Amino acid sequence: MNRARQCLMVMASLALAAGALTGTATAAPPGTAPPAQEQLLTTLDPQRLAASGPRQESMSAALPAGKTCTDLPASKGRKDGARACTEVTRTAGSRTAVPLAAGTCSVQPGYYHFDRHSYCLSDARLTYTLYDPVNGSVKGVGEISLSGSATLDARSGWWNELFTATVTRLEGNVRSLAVKLTASCANSCGMLNADAWGTKVLVLGQSASSHVTFSSYPARGTVTQITPQYALQLYQPGDTPGDWSHNWSLPTKVRCDAESAGYGCVIGQIRVQLNLPLSQWGAAAATYWYGQAALVDHWGAPDNPLRRNKNEAQAIANRYRTCKEGSSIPFYKQDDIPTDSCDEYPFAGTFQGGKDGGSCAEILPKFEGGTWKIYYFLDRKPTGYEPCVRGHVPLKQNTDAGGEVGRFIQDERVLDAEQFTVSTEG
């Protein structure tokens, strides 16, 4: 009998040792300390991320410089011929402020500002100068302020661009200006409205405002890069405008695609950011934060963005390898995390996803005492050199975060292999 009892004790000891090697945790009653196999790795103060908030990329570029001149014949208002030039004015020292009726554009005057879903032009100055054709002396000057704004639609192939032109300066023989603005576009694009306002004759302080409309409907599964183009005519009433105008193109391209359901347009040059704030996405966001902040590859940071993989079969295979039976170390659900599930980072739907789950850092994010605490299994302490992270995340937070990633792909028109960053701030 004593010998049998000793054998049972040895078998029990072996079973406990095996459980420790596989990382199995003992369930903890609510409100008690974590199981003994779990150790605190680090903490994350929600206020630290909430203070800064997410940052979206943007860019700016100057209105392209240029000068266009033409010889004018005599007219009713001028007995002799003249030479007229229209050019972009770069100096801003003597500018008269004008309201930006075409929309507020937070960039220095004379520049375009772009983000993923819009672009605008801020108070660009263009001058019309009248020269004596014989001695080249200046006979008169007119100036306009041109501002514009456009909002792209991620679920439509057309958009309006609103313009406002205001006469800000008239000198000498230039007492008014005729202003005409038209638009066109290149590469699988058409104009629903090419002429902003026809021809408007304006005196000092007067404005003209209206819009042009671009349209693009690429074939299903294709992508097109559109270049909006513009032509501005400034001349004096009574003169023949002729075939000359001041021409320029938008300094970036508008990308329209039909890769997924429907059409949509964005500024593809602006890299987009996926926002999954810790305050909203809880343990899922804490897992992504840890993967980006604590692991050597810091996936999804600006200097190491993720790349979308639209192959759904590959995403399923990636998830199988990281979180399911394909992992060399199984994922064991923990009783002290309600509806525990495996959430992986990098995401399965990226080219960086699909790492062996056995090679991932495995963490248990828990919100305790107003702070996120990141635990690990005693026999699998993360080193920071793992290529991925598996988080123990309540199932609803996991699936809801996955749904948000799907909405992000649609709302931002993220194409296959396109880069994006991830932020858990806010």
Which positions does each model-derived feature cover?
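Secretory targeting and sorting signals
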Residues: 1-30
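Short hydrophobic beta-strand that contains or immediately precedes a catalytic carboxylate
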Residues: 342
